[in-house]
Amino acid sequence: MPGAHVVFAEPRHSYPGFAEGVGEEEMESRKPGQPYVLGHDPLELARLDRQAAIIERPTRMLLQAAGMAAGWRVLDVGTGLGHVARIAGEIVGPTGAVIGIDPSVQALAVARERAEAAGVRHVSFEEGDVSTWSTRQPFDAIVGRLLLFHLGDPVAAVRQSTRNLRNGGQFIAVDFDLGGARSEPRVGLAADVLGWIEQAFTVAGASPRIGARLGMILREAGLEQVATFGVQAYLSPQDRTSAALIAGVARTLAPVIVERGIATAEQLGIDTLEDRLAAEFQRADAVMLPPTVVGAWGAVTGR
């Protein structure tokens, strides 16, 4: 799919540290099982913007494949900077409505400012957490992108969210599967760093391969008519996107990587990592396959 450069997570928006959710705590202060392992200083927010731009097309494809259409009422949980809320708003149009919720006041301020600047009135944002937020007016769809990746009990989170769906409404999960990330042919430095990133996410309480399990999670949460598929990008040796994304996530996760003994600061060499990765990809004439962007959706029935 030309131009569909799919890369790591946002928890809470694009490859983030592969996630989108915007929490204000720094990653090193997080404990296993807490919902978001990536910090959100200005550099991290900028990285999330870059990541979101890269996975915008796959996200739009997956939302439309799930049936989202004009006039729908949509809830975006863990909205972060509002990237998914904006995409959903474009799909549902002015006859629909989108509400994005997130616990981060910092992220929501940015999301609101952007929506206002764009003159978008049918997309709004509220402070709230997926485990407690509720409304009396049910939604046609609830979207969680790069959300379940960071949650200790994703099944419970889906169950909690679906109480806000109408009968027949869809829960749509979009997340990464880091298990397939690799280069062809193999580039040793990239393989090492991707391995360190996956280990760091795991010890920090995230689930870096959760994309492969999304369908199972939705079924366990009681959803019916579950469907799932993934979108895979192939980045050319000359495309620095691969190096920039890998190095950006590694920089965010560096405290965990070093403090947990996954790799030393010298092995990581974070200040030169992007340039070294880019050079290795070109030297090996290697195509990079970033983590697969997986979508799964299912309906609430019997209400």
Residue ranges and their predicted role:
Residues 172-240, 258-259:
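Conserved catalytic/acceptor-binding region of the Class I
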Residues 140-154:
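A short SAM/SAH-binding and catalytic strip from SAM-dependent methyltransferases
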Residues 75-77, 81-133:
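Class I SAM-dependent methyltransferase SAM/SAH-binding core
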Residues 15-18, 22-45, 49-50:
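N-terminal, positively charged/glycine-rich alpha-helical extensions of SAM-dependent methyltransferases
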Residues 155-170:
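A short glycine-rich, Lys/Arg-flanked "PGG" loop and its adjoining helix->strand segment in the class I
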Residues 132-142:
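A short acidic, Gly/Pro-enriched loop at the edge of an enzyme's catalytic core
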Residues 53-72, 87:
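Conserved alpha-helix/loop element of class I SAM-dependent methyltransferases that forms part
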